[in-house]
Amino acid sequence: MALERTFSIIKPDAVAKNVIGAIYNRFESAGLRIVASKMIHMSKEQAEGFYAEHKERPFFGALVDFMTSGPVMVQVLEGENAVLANREIMGATNPADAASGTLRSDYAASIDENAVHGSDAPESAAREIAYFFSEEEICPRTR
């Protein structure tokens, strides 16, 4: 088992539903520790930069509009195999396909407004964490 970090976003739809605490409880109940967290309202430039890999996809404009439509919570999660653990907690990208009891099954309305984002690999996690957090903002949990 490898101790690793992953990046997570609670998207505008879930923030609007006031389920931040419930989502944090799921992370912690699964053994993940929140080592950095902040609420931000992404600018168009931030959202375009973060999702730059999707720039040529037909959904890019709608994704940027959605991610800038309200505040989001960005956080760094740490734990054993954190990337995979968080992806299991989130469930399938499309909430219609998400297993019962996952975040997307419980809190997402559609594939477009699917409540949460999580890194898909340790390499993307490192890049995404650095996009929103300086090393000084991350507080390792040693106790």
Curated annotation (Swiss-Prot):
InterPro entries: NDK-like_dom, NDK-like_dom_sf, Nucleoside_diP_kinase, Nucleoside_diP_kinase_AS. It comes from the Bacteria. Keywords: ATP-binding, Cytoplasm, Kinase, Magnesium, Metal-binding, Nucleotide metabolism, Nucleotide-binding, Phosphoprotein, Transferase. Its EC number is 2.7.4.6. SUPFAM superfamilies: Nucleoside diphosphate kinase, NDK. Gene3D superfamilies: Nucleoside diphosphate kinase-like domain. Pfam families: NDK (PF00334). The active site is at residue 117. GO terms for biological process: CTP biosynthetic process; GTP biosynthetic process; UTP biosynthetic process. HAMAP family: NDP_kinase. Belongs to the NDK family. Homotetramer. This is Nucleoside diphosphate kinase.
